[in-house]
Regions:
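Short hydrophobic beta-strand element within catalytic cores of glycosyltransferases
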Residues: 165-168
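Aromatic "clamp/platform" in nucleotide-sugar-dependent glycosyltransferases that forms part
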Residues: 148
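Conserved donor-binding/catalytic core segment of Leloir-type glycosyltransferases
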Residues: 58-90, 97-100
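Nucleotide-activated donor-binding/catalytic signature segment of Leloir-type glycosyltransferases, i.e.
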Residues: 110-131
Length: 226
């Protein structure tokens, strides 16, 4: 996981011992290899997580520009960053935020319910079955990954194969999947920068096409047959 790769290995002796014992290590995107100490890199391979688009693709919402966030509500995911950014949008923006994921603590549950009450753009759907989640991603105009760290988020591959562009924090796990030249990055925790990207994607068709075309070019990498 991202926490293992980008946090625990550096100071966790048990994690380091596991690396010593392993004959082969797998990371989920190519940048992950460089997060490992030099002595482990030679026995490390990259395996991208594959994904299949849903069998039935739903049409995007007609009157709203739907943005989806997928992931359980944990601090490392910075789960309310997109909701916070949506509050900064101008009144005439059609952006709405659909949030899919379970609240793993009572405080996260309270925060999600409170956000729904104060933010008319935000809807929290809780945990959904995988097929429903994939349909929601495919219906969306954008997927946002706001995590502080990721080993290689499978939701990115699910969005890419569904033809849904991604906005992501500028983190190694996303750089390895989307490429360093992808135009849809924002700094960790930067609500204003995310709001600006959201509005640009909604209002600038050229920018949105750049995001979409870039993702479509990478879709074959996540084909199960690849």
């Amino acid at each position: 996981t991202g926490t293992d790769l980008y946090h625990d290995i550096a100071g966790n002796q048990a994690a380091q011992h596991s690396l010593d014992l392993a004959k082969r290590l797998i990371v989920l995107q190519p940048y992950g290899i460089h997060a490992l100490p030099d002595e482990y890199q030679k026995k490390t391979v990259t395996v991208l997580q594959s994904a299949k688009p849903p069998a039935v693709l739903l049409k995007p919402l007609k009157h709203n520009f739907e943005v989806t966030v997928v992931g359980n509500l944990r601090a490392v995911k910075d789960p309310f960053r997109t909701a916070m950014a949506s509050r900064l949008l101008p009144d005439d923006s059609r952006i709405v935020v659909t949030h899919i994921g379970a609240a793993l603590t009572p405080s996260m549950n309270t925060r999600a319910n409170r956000e729904e009450q104060i933010n008319h753009r935000y809807t929290w759907r809780g945990s959904l079955a995988q097929n429903l989640t994939l349909k929601a991603i495919a219906r969306s105009r954008l997927l946002v990954v706001s995590s502080k760290m990721e080993g290689g988020a499978n939701v990115i591959s699910e969005a890419i194969v569904a033809g849904t562009p991604v906005l992501s924090t500028h983190i190694s796990g996303s750089l390895g999947m989307l490429g360093k030249d992808y135009p849809g990055y924002f700094p960790i925790g930067d609500t204003v920068a995310l709001a600006e990207l959201l509005l640009q994607a909604e209002t600038d068709t050229t920018f949105y096409k750049q995001l979409r075309d870039h993702c479509l070019k990478r879709a074959q990498r996540f084909n199960p047959a690849a």
